[in-house]
Swiss-Prot record:
It is found in: Cell membrane; Early endosome membrane; Late endosome membrane; Recycling endosome membrane. It comes from Rattus norvegicus. Residues 148-219 form the LRRCT domain. Its EC number is 2.7.10.1. It is an enzyme of class 2 (transferase). GO terms for molecular function: ATP binding; GPI-linked ephrin receptor activity; identical protein binding; kinase binding; nerve growth factor binding; nerve growth factor receptor activity; neurotrophin binding; neurotrophin p75 receptor binding. Residues 196-285, 295-368 form the Ig-like C2-type domain. Keywords: ATP-binding, Cell membrane, Developmental protein, Differentiation, Disulfide bond, Endosome, Glycoprotein, Immunoglobulin domain, Kinase, Leucine-rich repeat, Membrane, Neurogenesis, Nucleotide-binding, Phosphoprotein, Receptor, Repeat, Signal, Transferase, Transmembrane, Transmembrane helix, Tyrosine-protein kinase, Ubl conjugation. It catalyses: L-tyrosyl-[protein] + ATP = O-phospho-L-tyrosyl-[protein] + ADP + H(+). This is High affinity nerve growth factor receptor. Belongs to the protein kinase superfamily. Tyr protein kinase family. Insulin receptor subfamily. ATP binds at L519, G520, E521, G522, A523, F524, G525, K526, V527, K547. Residues 443-799 are cytoplasmic. It is a single-pass type I membrane protein.
Length: 799
């Protein structure tokens, strides 16, 4: 016999407060039901209590069954069985209690009609066993079986397993099997108990379309009850014929098709202990097939394709009949399919900013051992700007001035004008017109630049990533407070007309953006984490960061659109990706790539030697970043700066706070305009609104407000110092005025403890007082890449 030693209750347990609340509600209900003399009395709006002794022998046909959520039955010695149909109609039942009654048997499917049942109390009855099937599929929180004469058998092994796995408190009751006298043995000592063993034997030879396939399911185990096949995924793929019985079941698939691939064939078996099942997939070989679609313009151009075949075919692209060698600008990308049970694969041939040179015939060849297939498509990405092939010789034609001339020399005429000369003259005139237009634009842009150039502050609080970037044409730029209010930077900073076009900004529907929660706030407005649908073809939805514009003035809207145009142009793996804007309704939204680990400064601090001190009791990273990881971070920031420098853009506010960290230690340049609010101590306020990051600025920027690509190099040297100090503030021991004095007098930041001499040499190369003597960003990046690929052996003897 099995006995229950009650240490609370057997099985799952609700929280003490919840269980106490249930008991309290039942006690209060007793007062209301005291006057009820029927077999079952209502308790509250959806409860029923049946406690009159010996008046109930079945639970069928209870009054108000459709609305019941709690049913309490007690002292019913004639209630001995709970069958399949007894609880029919009680679909809303959450709690069932049958105690101190004569319940001897509960059918395996007794709770088929009560899928929401979560609290089951069958204590103090006459139960000798309870099948695992009885509670299968229920989300129980409480199961109470104490006070029942449970027999020690394999049928109760499932209960002991729950006890061993500590499922919601089952361990609180010890189940033991009775031996001789008062000796009790643990239920687990019965080694003959176990779920069935199921194995499917597959055909040894390869299967092709049209073949017949025979599968055999072998079942082993004690007290086997039933077994069968699950073939729901195979409908329509073949004719199925079952054969045999326990312990060996057969299945014949007649005239199989390629649709059988990736479909599960499942065999299951049950006994008193539990259920076991195993699934296999039959691989049907068939030749490759391919389909190509027309080129579509997305973020990159895409030539969509679909390929099928088993085994999966290899792919090769051809362009105008020649093998196409893939690069980082032209490459194959497969799309993740939501369907995992098909052999067909979908993808794109991605082309990054293709030109007329890429116009032509594209052919995809797919091949596997059973055959090959090819498909071709013509793609045109851009009209040819030339009326002739620049590789062909220019034809020369002659038109005589005097039609009466007797000379017929086809080689040369004195007054004839060759076509090549006409082309040259035309190009020269076009160049002159272009230069004239350029000067006009230069003059106008100097007067009405909308990228913060004519603002009263060098770095106003509302400036974001784009507001800190400027296109340089004639070397460095300087900005005095009076210039900021006046004519701007005539002759020094211009907006390149070819970079800004409203048509290139991607517009996102507001209905596709679902805001989740706020990430931060700046003077411009707020930044939210959001889900964006239909943004990328290979993802139904993705997390993004959404910047909402607070100000609604016309100037703010114009700045918004100009910033969007600029950000659309900046496309680099180490610049935070800008997806587009939403201008439907209000507020105006910008959608950026979401970088899950936040800004680089916080990331460095949380992964540094002082992480525990700064965490304030929160979980911290297991250890500080290693030398190789620090070099990788620095190299990525440098790569982004090389890209900006190649476009002649000046950042002006480069710092770790304005870099973001994503999954896999991917670092990108970009901020959402929040850094001046979050890191206000990093900025030095001059006058009313001007805030300068003086600790990152070179002498010429502090003294003369001169910003250039060389001033960005200086700032990068400070960023490198931040990285190797795990996010410390430059000149942290000095006030702003003291820091200005040190920088302008030529003092340098000391070498960090974790910094190898080679890296510090790069920092010093960035901090040369004369801008022309500083390392270029390209050289800095090359040196860091070399160090990252082979990190130097460096031992911090002081640490």
């Amino acid at each position: 016999m099995l006995r229950g030693q009650r240490h609370g209750q057997l099985g799952w347990h609700r929280p003490a407060a919840g269980l106490g609340g249930l008991v309290t509600s039942l006690m209060l209900a007793c007062a209301c039901a005291a006057s009820c003399r029927e077999t079952c009395c209502p308790v509250g709006p959806s409860g029923l209590r049946c406690t009159r002794a010996g008046t109930l022998n079945t639970l069928r046909g209870l009054r108000g069954a459709g609305n019941l959520t709690e049913l309490y039955v007690e002292n019913q010695r004639d209630l001995q069985r709970l069958e399949f149909e007894d609880l029919q109609g009680l679909g809303e039942l959450r709690s069932l209690t049958i105690v101190k009654s004569g319940l001897r048997f509960v059918a395996p499917d007794a709770f088929h009609f009560t899928p929401r049942l979560s609290h089951l109390n069958l204590s103090s009855n006459a139960l000798e066993s309870l099948s695992w099937k009885t509670v299968q599929g229920l989300s129980l929180q409480d199961l109470t079986l104490s006070g029942n004469p449970l027999h020690c058998s394999c049928a109760l092994l499932w209960l002991q397993r729950w006890e061993q796995e500590d499922l919601c408190g089952v361990y609180t009751q010890k189940l033991q099997g009775s031996g001789s006298g008062d000796q009790f043995l643990p239920l687990g000592h019965n080694n003959s108990c176990g779920v069935p063993s199921v194995k499917i034997q597959m055909p040894n030879d390869s299967v092709e379309v049209g073949d017949d396939v025979f599968l055999q399911c072998q079942v082993e185990g004690q007290a086997l009850q039933q077994a069968d096949w699950i073939l729901t995924e195979l409908e329509g793929t073949a004719t199925m014929k079952k054969s045999g019985d326990l312990p060996s079941l057969g299945l014949t698939l007649v005239n199989v098709t390629s649709d059988l691939n990736k479909k599960n064939v499942t065999c299951w078996a049950e006994n008193d202990v539990g259920r076991a099942e195993v699934s296999v997939q039959v691989s049907v070989s068939f030749p490759a097939s391919v389909h190509l679609g027309k080129a579509v313009e997305q973020h990159h151009w895409c030539i969509p394709f679909s390929v099928d075949g088993q085994p999966a075919p290899s792919l090769r692209w051809f362009f105008n009949g020649s093998v196409l060698n893939e690069t980082s600008f032209i490459f194959t990308q497969f799309l993740e399919s939501a369907l995992t049970n098909e052999t067909m694969r979908h993808g794109c041939l991605r082309l990054n900013q293709p030109t007329h040179v890429n116009n032509g015939n594209y052919t995809l060849l797919a091949a596997n051992p059973y055959g090959q297939a090819a498909a071709s498509i013509m793609a045109a990405f851009m009209d040819n700007p030339f009326e002739f092939n620049p590789e062909d010789p220019i034809p020369v034609s002659f038109s005589p001035v005097d039609t009466n001339s007797t000379s017929r020399d086809p080689v040369e005429k004195k007054d004839e004008t060759p076509f090549g000369v006409s082309v040259a003259v035309g190009l020269a005139v076009s160049a002159a017109l272009f230069l004239s237009a350029l000067l006009l634009v230069l003059n106008k842009c100097g007067q009405r630049s909308k990228f913060g150039i004519n603002r009263p502050a060098v770095l106003a609080p509302e400036d974001g990533l784009a507001m800190s970037l400027h296109f340089m044409t004639l070397g460095g730029s300087s900005l005095s407070p009076t210039e900021g209010k006046g004519s701007g930077l005539q002759g020094h900073i211009m907006e390149n007309p070819q970079y800004f076009s409203d048509t290139c900004v991607h517009h996102i529907k507001r209905q596709d953006i679902i805001l989740k929660w706020e990430l931060g706030e700046g003077a411009f407005g707020k930044v939210f984490l959001a889900e964006c649908y239909n943004l990328l073809n290979d993802q139904d939805k993705m997390l993004v960061a959404v910047k909402a514009l607070k100000e609604t003035s016309e100037n703010a809207r114009q700045d918004f659109h100009r910033e969007a145009e600029l950000l659309t142009m900046l496309q680099h793996q180490h610049i935070v990706r800008f997806f587009g804007v939403c201008t439907e309704g209000g507020p105006l939204l910008m959608v950026f790539e979401y970088m899950r680990h936040g800004d680089l400064n916080r990331f460095l601090r949380s992964h540094g030697p002082d992480a525990k001190l700064l965490a304030g009791g929160e979980d911290v990273a297991p250890g500080p970043l290693g030398l190789g990881q620090l070099l990788a971070v620095a190299s990525q920031v440098a790569a982004g700066m090389v890209y900006l420098a190649s476009l002649h853009f000046v950042h002006r506010d480069l710092a770790t706070r304005n870099c973001l960290v994503g999954q896999g230690l991917v670092v990108k340049i970009g901020d959402f305009g929040m850094s001046r609010d979050i890191y206000s101590t990093d900025y030095y306020r001059v006058g009313g609104r001007t805030m300068l990051p003086i600790r990152w600025m070179p002498p010429e920027s502090i003294l003369y407000r001169k910003f250039s690509t060389e001033s960005d190099v200086w700032s990068f040297g400070v960023v490198l110092w931040e990285i190797f100090t795990y996010g410390k503030q430059p000149w942290y021991q000095l006030s702003n005025t003291e820091a200005i004095e040190c920088i302008t007098q030529g003092r340098e930041l000391e070498r960090p403890r974790a910094c190898p001499p080679d890296v510090y040499a790069i920092m010093r190369g960035c901090w040369q007082r004369e801008p022309q003597q500083r390392l270029s960003m390209k050289d800095v990046h090359a040196r860091l890449q070399a160090l990252a690929q082979a990190p130097p052996s460096y031992l911090d003897v002081l640490g």
